């Protein structure tokens, strides 16, 4: 499974890259707004750091506007992936962009038929939002399970990006189901490393090591 970082903060991206596990980045207008910086400045900074796919969202609501914004964004770099909402106009735009060879990430997916339509239109990725579904009382991982089965049934090459990750259990469940990618907030990514017994064991090892005579380091 690949790991994308769901952020627009370059400090977080640099840290994850240093860990050696960063495969890409996803952004959205909300994340960019949180930086307090200009849109193009944020995007260019991210593209200068990340070698893998970087999802950047259009804000137009009509298909033609989405396509025009997508074409403009794609000129920023080959790693740019266009985030498109799972609407009728969005799916129309995905079809056009797929024919132009521009990769797309269909976002705000909350039911499996949206993912099916996106894949039919040629989407490169689909992003089911599990955290937001849980917020309204749904078993969100059922959505990922259904999308994975549908894609396997029909041989779609569209990859599943599990998004709106709230805790490590979401990542674990996604990995168990065979999702292609998880896009994870930085704070959750940090939690993936942690276990109390790891810390306790390391503390004990270091304490014991300090008692070893003639230590080389």
UniProtKB/Swiss-Prot annotation:
Q: What organism does the record attribute this protein to?
A: Coprothermobacter proteolyticus (strain ATCC 35245 / DSM 5265 / OCM 4 / BT)
Annotated GO biological process: carbohydrate metabolic process; pentose-phosphate shunt
Name the keywords, alphabetized: Cytoplasm, Pentose shunt, Schiff base, Transferase
Predominant place of localization: cytoplasm
From the UniProt record, report the name of the gene that encodes this protein.
tal
* PROSITE patterns noted in UniProt: TRANSALDOLASE_1, TRANSALDOLASE_2
NCBIfam families documented for this protein: fsa_talC_mipB (TIGR00875)
State the name under which the record lists this protein: Probable transaldolase
UniProt lists the family membership as follows: Belongs to the transaldolase family. Type 3B subfamily.
């Amino acid at each position: 499974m690949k790991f994308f970082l769901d952020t627009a903060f370059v400090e977080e991206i640099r840290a994850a890259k240093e860990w050696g596990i960063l495969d890409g980045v996803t952004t959205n207008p909300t994340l960019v707004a949180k930086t307090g910086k200009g849109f193009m400045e944020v995007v260019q900074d991210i593209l200068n750091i990340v070698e893998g796919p970087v999802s950047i969202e259009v804000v137009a609501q009509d298909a033609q506007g989405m396509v025009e914004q997508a074409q403009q964004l794609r000129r920023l770099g080959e790693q740019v992936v266009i985030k498109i909402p799972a609407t009728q106009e969005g799916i129309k735009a995905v079809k056009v962009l797929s024919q132009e060879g521009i990769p797309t990430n269909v976002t705000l997916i909350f039911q499996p038929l949206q993912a099916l339509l996106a894949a039919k239109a040629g989407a490169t990725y689909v992003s089911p939002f599990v955290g937001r579904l849980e917020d309204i009382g749904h078993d969100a991982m059922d959505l990922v399970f259904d999308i994975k089965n549908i894609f396997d049934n029909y041989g779609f090459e569209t990859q599943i990006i599990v998004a709106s990750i709230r805790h490590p259990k979401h990542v674990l469940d996604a990995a168990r189901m065979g999702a292609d990618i998880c896009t994870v907030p930085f704070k959750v990514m940090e939690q993936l490393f942690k276990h109390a017994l790891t810390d306790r064991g390391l503390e004990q090892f270091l304490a014991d090591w300090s008692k070893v005579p003639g230590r080389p380091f």
